[in-house]
Structure formats: structure tokens, C-alpha cells
Amino acid sequence: MRIFRKETTVSTNLDAREGVPGDVFVAEHQSAGRGRLDHTWLSAKGENLTFSVVLAGADRSPAEIATLPLVVGLAVIKALGRFAPLALKWPNDVLSGGRKLAGILCERNGDNVIAGIGINVNQTSFPPKIAARATSLAAICGRSFNRDEVLSDVLESLDRWHGKWLAEGFVSLHGDLAAVDCLRGRTVCVRQVDDDAAPVSGFCGGIAKDGSLIVDGRPIYAGEAHIGG
């Protein structure tokens, strides 16, 4: 594993396009950090973790590759869940107490997949527009954390769970994901990726074995989910 560090970069996912599987690209600040659906990732310089990991697996089917954000989210939860109860919000957010602790953006790049990961570690004051929806390890636990240790723990966990995904497929992780699925059994509203598609609201049956989200018995493969109708 090689770890490349920058003080400032446009995006660690862009940096990772030059990497090979196992490479990790870390930055203190991203001038254009991105989340899913063109959302901006906001992170205080020097307090959190923003990094990208180059993963093998781009040779898998598009449907299997689409499950990788869930795999990465599970790895983050397995690494950090000892500090607080954590949950996964389909398809790519890690929550604590309903607030966002980490976000994930996976992108295919040639023969590889790039997993961009943002984790709120020591930030305790957030911009007003996200303050009610964000949290951090420090805010949860009332103490600061060594960010390099957090990074090491997450990378070790990611190596394990991504390896299991490569060897046994997404279905082998389904039970672990179901145990941390925060949407299952709730009423949800899903804004689909297709702008012409109407939002879907209904009872959430949880994450299916193919990575889709089941809402009123119907599988949804891409979108942004929120609790409530």
C-alpha cells in the first residue's frame, strides 16, 4: 500500500486516477471535493479525513460495481463502530444518531474503481446549512482523535471487506449490511437519479441482495433516500 499526501488538491478522486489498486490519496483540503449527485463535500481543513482508495474490481458487472459504496460504508462502520452505534443510509452515508459522520463516492476509472471517503473526525462546529445534519467522532465521543490512526483502522477494514466482496460477491455481505441498515422498516422518500422520474415514497423493506433498496416491494437501484414520506 502506498499513501500519497497533499496539503491541498482539487479532488482526491481526481488524484487517484493515476494510481493502482491499493494506492491511497489523502488531502487536508479539497477545493472541489464532491459527493454523490454533484453534492459538495464540506470539510474543515486539518480536522477531518478526506481520501481516496484505488480498488480492484472494475472487471465485475456494472450491477456488482454499483454495490461498492455499500461495501465501503460497511467497512467504515466496522472500523469505527466501537466508538459509537453507527448505521448505513443507502446508498453511501454513514450516520450516528441520524447525523452524517461519513460519505462515500465510488467512480469507475479504467480497470479500477476509486472510492472517495470523507470522515468527520475532529470537527465540532459545522456550517449552519449542515449543522443539524452532521456529526463527528469528536462530537460523539467528547474527545479528539488521531487522524492517522483512524485512517489506518479504516484502510485495514476496507481491505478485509473489499477482499470479501472480490472473493465471494456482494451477497456474502448482505447479512452484515442488513444489521446496520437504518432505513429498513421506515417510511422513506427516494429521489431517483433520473430527473424526469417522480420521487418514490413508501415502506422500506431494506437493502436487497443485489444492493437495491426495496420501497413498497419495488427495487430502486440509484437515488437519494430520506426518512419520511
Positions of PLM-derived features:
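N-terminal lobe of the biotin/lipoate ligase/transferase fold
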Residues: 1-82, 184
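Long, positively charged amphipathic alpha-helical accessory segments at protein N-termini or as interdomain linkers
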Residues: 21, 58-86, 96-229
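Basic side chains
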Residues: 34-36, 89, 147
